[in-house]
Amino acid sequence: MALKKYNPTTPGQRQLVMVDRSALYKGKPVKTLTEGKHSNGGRNNTGRITVRFRGGGHKKTYRLVDFKRTKVDVPAKVERLEYDPNRTAFIALIKYEDGEQAYILAPQRLAVGDTVIAGAYVDVKPGNVMPLGNMPIGTIVHNVELKIGKGGQIARSAGTYAQLVGRDHDYVIMRLNSGEQRLVHGRCTATIGAVSNPDHMNISIGKAGRTRWLGWRPHNRGVVMNPIDHPHGGGEGRTSGGRHPVTPWGKPTKGKKTRSNKSTDKFILISRHKRKKK
C-alpha cells in the first residue's frame, strides 16, 4: 500500500505521512475473535512503573491472532484484510472449509479470495504454513517458531521476514532481518512470505498528540532531571551529565553487552552485532 500525504493546513498536517489503508475492511472485527484489553499505563501487578513513559492512548480491542496454524490440511479462504491497532502489520480474516474463522498475520501479496493452507508439504506461496525442514533453501518466511508447537515468534512486525539459507542435520539456518544467522529446528513451522505493510517504516507521526493517541507519554532526558531522579541529574546550569551515559538505575547504556542467556549461544551462528564491528 502507498504512503499518504496531507495538505499543510496545520503544522501537524504538514509533517504527517501515513500508510494509505483505504483497501482494508472498514467494519468492526469478528466479535468471537476479540477480547477486552486492559490498559495498565506501564504498571505491573504491584502498581509500580515497569515501562516508563506509557499511559493514556485510545482504547483498543485485542484481536486473537492465530500464530500456531495447527489446523493442518484444511484449506481456508481469505475473507478480508483488516487493520489491527495492537500491531504494525495488517491481519487477514480466513474462513476454513468447515466454517471456522481465524485471524492470521497478513503477508505481502495476499489478496481477498486467495486460499491458504497449512501442512507438511504445501505450495510455496504467501500465507501457506509448513515445517522449515520441508522448505526449499532461499524461501522467504515470517512468523517463525523457535520452539516446536509454541507458535511463531520471529518476524511478526510490519515488513519483516527471515530467509532460509541452509540446513544442518535436524536444524535449518535462518538469516534474520538484523543480520543474525541462527539455527532453528526443522520441525518448527513458519509462514511463507514477508509480513504486510512494509511502508510502516516510512510513516511520520506528524505531531506529539498522535504519539499520545498511541499510548506514549513525553520522554524526559536524564540531564534535565534532579539528582534524586537520575544519575545524570543536577548541576548548576546546563551540564553534560558528568559521566558515561547510564540508565536511570546506573547501568551503562549505549553499547554495553547485556545478554546473559548462554544456553542458547550455540544456536546463534553469526551475531547481529558483527556488522557493527566492521
Curated annotation (Swiss-Prot):
Family annotation (Pfam families): Ribosomal_L2, Ribosomal_L2_C
Keywords, comma-separated and alphabetical: Ribonucleoprotein, Ribosomal protein, RNA-binding, rRNA-binding
Keyword rRNA-binding attached: yes
GO cellular component labels: large ribosomal subunit
Signal peptide limits: none
An example Gene Ontology molecular-function term: rRNA binding
Chain ranges passing through the membrane: none
Region spans: Disordered: 226-278
GO-annotated biological processes: cytoplasmic translation
PROSITE patterns: RIBOSOMAL_L2 (PS00467)
Subunit structure: Part of the 50S ribosomal subunit. Forms a bridge to the 30S subunit in the 70S ribosome.
Function field: One of the primary rRNA binding proteins. Required for association of the 30S and 50S subunits to form the 70S ribosome, for tRNA binding and peptide bond formation. It has been suggested to have peptidyltransferase activity; this is somewhat controversial. Makes several contacts with the 16S rRNA in the 70S ribosome.
Record-stated family: Belongs to the universal ribosomal protein uL2 family.
Annotated NCBIfam families: rplB_bact (TIGR01171)
Name listed for the protein in its UniProt record: Large ribosomal subunit protein uL2
Organism expressing this protein natively: Rhodopseudomonas palustris (strain HaA2)
Top-level taxonomy: Bacteria, Pseudomonadati, Pseudomonadota, Alphaproteobacteria, Hyphomicrobiales
